[in-house]
């Protein structure tokens, strides 16, 4: 699997009009300071990931104004990495995959008639639930921003929640559901995907166990521009 059909690759998330800024510092998980038009202002970071290779002092980021009354004046959407753009919004992949799956644009999942978001199962809520004559399917979508020497890696910080989701997907397979985890790499320079066993060995082990139990795993890289984010291609998974 190294390509997408034209329908899937043409579905996109349109970004708001963006302003170039300079990242100053990360205040906490969800707030960073940026310099824009000569002023230093707080900006919402839409991800709990560390993203140290993207959000560091002096790096170029792209932001949009927040509505009045919010705690932060801006929202960070993209960060520059060498000559490419990286989307840092951890919820964008969920929106993109819901849009793609709702249009039946990925052949692996085109046989389901019903597509829902945020459906509960056990002690978890999975991002997408598919239902139809083909059966029932849970999908968990993971946002990936870290790429090291061409290898996309997840997570970039220990993720107990991520391991829990994998365990629940495994349990769902045992109860007759189809289950899948889709890693969306929000940049286009990844050649393959691997779990980040050094940062989170528990997640890596849990992922291997999930695959052995029948959970499907896919990884897709994105084409990211100042205007849109869209799926670009499948990349191989290496455990």
From Swiss-Prot:
InterPro entries, per the entry: SfsA (IPR005224), SfsA_C (IPR040452), SfsA_N (IPR041465)
GO molecular function: DNA binding
Superkingdom classification of source: Bacteria
Disulphide bond pairs: none
CDD domains named among the record's database cross-references: SfsA-like_bacterial (cd22359)
HAMAP family, sorted: SfsA
Family recorded in the similarity comment: Belongs to the SfsA family.
Family matches, as NCBIfam families: sfsA (TIGR00230)
Name of the protein in question: Sugar fermentation stimulation protein homolog
Primary gene name: sfsA
């Amino acid at each position: 699997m190294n390509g997408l059909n034209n329908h899937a690759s043409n579905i996109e998330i349109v970004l708001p009009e963006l302003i170039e800024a300079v990242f100053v510092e990360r205040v906490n998980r969800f707030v960073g300071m940026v310099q824009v038009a000569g002023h230093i202002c707080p900006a919402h970071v839409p991800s709990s990931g560390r993203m140290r290779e993207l959000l560091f002092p002096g790096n170029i980021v792209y932001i949009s104004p927040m509505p009045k009354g919010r705690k932060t004046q801006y929202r960070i959407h993209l960060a520059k990495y060498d000559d490419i753009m990286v989307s840092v919004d951890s919820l964008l992949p969920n929106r993109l995959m819901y849009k793609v799956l709702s249009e039946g644009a990925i052949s692996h999942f085109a046989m389901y008639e019903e597509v829902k978001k945020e459906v509960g199962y056990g002690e978890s809520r999975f991002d997408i639930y598919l239902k139809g004559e083909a059966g029932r399917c849970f999908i968990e979508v993971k946002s990936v921003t870290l790429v090291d020497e061409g290898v996309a890696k997840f997570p970039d910080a220990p993720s107990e929640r991520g391991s829990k989701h994998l365990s629940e997907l495994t349990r769902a397979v045992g109860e007759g559901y189809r289950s899948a985890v889709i890693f969306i790499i929000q940049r286009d320079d990844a050649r393959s995907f691997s779990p980040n066993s050094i940062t989170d060995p528990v997640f890596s082990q849990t992922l291997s166990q999930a695959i052995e139990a029948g959970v499907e795993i896919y990884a897709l890289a994105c084409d990211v521009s100042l205007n849109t984010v869209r799926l670009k291609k499948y990349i191989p998974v290496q455990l």
